[in-house]
Amino acid sequence: MPKLQGFEFWSRTLGGARHVVAPMVDQSELAWRLLSRRHGAQLCYTPMLHAQVFVRDANYRKENLYCDVCPEDRPLIVQFCANDPEVFVQAALLAQDYCDAIDLNLGCPQMIAKRGHYGAFLQEEWDLLQRMILLAHERLSVPVTCKIRVFPEIDKTVRYAQMLEKAGCQLLTVHGRTKEQKGPMAGTASWEHIKAVRKAVGIPVFANGNIQCLQDVERCIQDTGVQGVMSAEGNLHNPALFEGRSPAVWELAEEYLDIVRQHPCPLSYVRAHLFKLWHHTLQVHQQLREELAKVKTLEGVAAVSQALKLRCQEDMSRQQEGVRPADNLPAFHWICQPYIRPGPREGSKENSGGRSKRALEEEEGSMEGLSKNKLKKQLRNPHKTFDPSLKPKYAKCDQCGNPKGNRCVFNLCRGCCKKRAFRETADCPGHGLLFKTKLEKSLAWKGTQPGLQEAQQVRPVTPSGFSEVVGSALA
Ligand SMILES: Cc1cc2nc3c(=O)[nH]c(=O)nc-3n(C[C@H](O)[C@H](O)[C@H](O)COP(=O)(O)O)c2cc1C
């Protein structure tokens, strides 16, 4: 069957999806996607996957895609970050049988994307992007799509979108914030930019940014004319957003934990989800926040969830009629609701007390005083300095651009070093890889075994023969 394109792809393959769960590193994992789909999401994206790692590392492919196959988890778009046409296409070819389209991340504004040269840091490299999209469009059996951030100028954003469309992009998600609008500087997304793109291209467009409830979805579609709306933070705080419901926070937590039992994921993902889902409740019941941070098992998390449910139910039963929710919240803390991130200097209860780790980290650079955690660290080590300019700079792996191991003899990251050391039967003590030493030991041992010596002469040991000896070291 010929590959469907543009609007036909959106309406037939994606079922005309309007309610879309965003790609979210460590957060749009299978269990969360299934929860969101049960509550109105019609299309989900995987978290961003690193194309180069996906190509070279079979375990990464298994852990991040192949083991997460589930018939209810469709339609699904797999997102990659990449900056090389061949690598992008190789990764996409390995993923295309497990999804309905491949998305290129052109929106990540984080430092890690700057260092790895991907995401929004490719925004100015139109020639490279054209080549990446064109090659993917030609070689893949599924459509290629892009998720972009806007430029400050509407006309440049429009030309950018048109360039991607011309190269073969079949669906565009426009996050209406610029690369600089992140963390405490995120502000609001510009639907004006999104509307202008929608008018100027002939492919379906999803809007992203400022979506906190179902009314926002309807308003955004009306104002901008887009085909669908994507939500990240709104979905994390209320996965029933697309149903237009705001359930009790423990209800969705319990349902999510049940799904995680069937489709396990790292505990760090689960914890991060619950911190968001319970954001407002944990402001009130700080003890539970600490317990959640400390638990080490899924059953431990379930126990915290049970305790939180009881506390919330007590709070509900004590609630007097006519009393409004505290802190100008739209609903009481036990109801799933949006979290509006405070601006850079905005005064709020959060700014005076138990703020999130992330909020503290984001302001790190601009704070004159030190956070509680940093003060504690300084007490333990009086010579510790928190001046960002004195932080050691990450040196890059010569091969893939990830941070290299400090003591690596090859100047590579662990993954690349392991491959090279294996190929060359070498040691890298910095990474604890001892292929050469193990081979020598194994040969010495074989030398002491009379029966084996004979076999040795018939079959000389080469690096590939070596794999039989230490194959398990690579598992
Ligand atoms: C926890 C988290 C992880 C994210 N990871 C990704 C990602 O992997 N790929 C991507 O394109 N955007 C990622 N984003 C950005 C979102 O997809 C989205 O563009 C952004 O949050 C704006 O949407 P919102 O206003 O609905 O939050 C992430 C956002 C969050 C909150």
From Swiss-Prot:
EC number(s) from the headed UniProt entry: 1.3.1.88
MF GO annotations: flavin adenine dinucleotide binding; tRNA-dihydrouridine16 synthase activity; tRNA-dihydrouridine17 synthase activity
GO cellular component: cytoplasm; nucleus
Superkingdom assignment: Eukaryota
EC supergroup of this enzyme: oxidoreductase
Cofactor or coenzyme needed: FMN
Keyword terms: Cytoplasm, Flavoprotein, FMN, NAD, NADP, Nucleus, Oxidoreductase, tRNA processing
Biased composition (Basic residues): 373-383
Entry binding sites for FMN: P23, M24, V25, Q79, K147, H175, N208, G209, N210, A232, E233
Main location: cytoplasm
Role, per record: Catalyzes the synthesis of dihydrouridine, a modified base found in the D-loop of most tRNAs. Specifically modifies U16 and U17 in cytoplasmic tRNAs. Affects the level of some mature tRNA and thereby the total cellular translation.
Name of the featured protein: tRNA-dihydrouridine(16/17) synthase [NAD(P)(+)]-like
